[in-house]
Amino acid sequence: IVSYIFSSFKIYDRPHMDEQYRHVYKAAQEMDGVNYHGTVSNDQIREELTKNHIMAYPSVYMETSCISVIEAMSAKCMVVCPNLGALPETCANFAWMYGYEPGPEKHIAVHSHILGRAIESYRKDETEVLLSLQKTYFDTFYNWDMRMNQWNQFLESIKMRIEMEKNDTT
């Protein structure tokens, strides 16, 4: 098992914060079985995801959505994550999801257990079928062209409502 880490505060336009985590990045670079890459382009991440099998995502943030998970699931990666924030809706019942634990030690234990089960089941035929269905779902419902059309329809409906209200008052 090899872990690929793509992480840095540069992506959040806060590169100065990397300094306080330099020891963490250095430890990751020196670990056997870990390939630390820092921040890379979105195109490179999407390419790398197609070469991977599982995304371990032990998030502790109340996400409103998660583009990382969406792109991993579109790349046929199995995702292991907590049921925190909007991750249940984002993952659409495809993730190996577990109940979020606020205590770090308990969270690590639960995440590790579920991740181990996901690794054990990865090569099963039914997993491949589910991952193919997952890819189809995410490529369909998280498609940027479709999202653009939905937003255009939404904004058009607001515009129409404003025009109707304006006509009603005149």
Regions flagged by a language model, labelled:
Residues 16-43:
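Nucleotide-activated donor-binding/catalytic signature segment of Leloir-type glycosyltransferases, i.e.
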